[in-house]
Amino acid sequence: MPRKSKKNAVQKLSRGGVVVETSAGPIQFGIPPETIKDTMTSKSGVPGTFVALDPLFNHERGISFCELEFPIYFNFYVMRRKIRVVCSKSTKQRVVTFIKEAAFGPEKINLISEYIGGMGNRAMPDLHKEMSFFRRNPFKGGERTQLSDMVTFSLFDKDGAVELPGDISIRYEKATQGYRVFDNGVQVAEVAEKLELPANRKTKTKEANSKRRKRPFYPPLFGVTVIGSGHGFDPTADTSGFVLWINHRGIIVDPPVDSTKWLADREVTRKHVNALILTHCHADHDAGTLQKLFEEQKIPIYTSRTIMDSFVRKASAITGLSQSRVRSLIDYHPITMGPPIRIN
């Protein structure tokens, strides 16, 4: 009989997910947004092995359980190693789709409709050339970085088992609906199949109570509310995002995850913020934008067609919804570079 799991071998992350300590290094089960901020400050550090749990997306909270973009960058550029993703065969293609989109960008780009005058506009960048430059592998003499340089996969077999380097194995137990982790033949942990998300962590109860207003919030004629000022690798600060107030109406820009709850705790309701600007496609802001699609009815989103198309492809792979279904959740307003855009 295998030895019982060690309690100190399992670490629950504050943002969701579980890390299991093994002799071959930590293994993370479930990867909700920003969990790298938990592991960067942990004793064991950022894992190099990640188990993608099914389903990949929580529709109730609108949160991905497989946010691998920042762990990939940290492992590749800082640790100089590729990550290992453990998943089912059916899940692998979805993971490959959104990782390639996130790491390398769109395969095809057409900026003509995004610039006045099309190809005749001198301001139009050579985006293909820029992408090729940044895709150079700094550890291989500048040759083109491939997905295999960043990620390798280990797939569960038909019995729900997988063998990993270092004599580590993971077995799915249907009876208990969980995963057992073995280190050199000894069971060191058991992880539930269903990932538990912690209560919304944007605002703690004590802080929320202290922020309660004596009178209802009234949006300013002009102003800015900063939701966060940190970046995706800053464990001490919330990811950047803000609300721009114009004529008593709010426009949320690059919303981080759980931004709606953060605002609600300050009595800023959904009716106050009725438009969204997405400036880029990193996962820390994809997470908040995707979440808003599942929290409320269609919200107008203003961004370029290139950014929107990339967002839709990633969202489709993460949620399992078709691209047409994802688009149906969005009130999209394309932006053309140069002329002013009227919002609200």
Where are these regions (language model features)?
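Short beta-strand scaffold segments in enzyme catalytic cores
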Residues: 16-21, 179-180, 240-244
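Active-site metal-binding motif and surrounding structural segment of the metallo-beta-lactamase
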Residues: 37-87, 95, 249, 257-309, ...
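Beta-strand-turn-beta hairpins that frame and shape the catalytic cleft
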Residues: 23-26, 164-177, 217-224, 247-248, ...
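Long, compositionally biased, glycine/small-hydrophobic-enriched stretches that function as flexible linkers
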Residues: 1-175
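Metallo-beta-lactamase
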Residues: 128-173, 180, 196, 305-344
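Active-site flanking residues adjacent to catalytic metal/cofactor-binding acidic residues
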Residues: 253
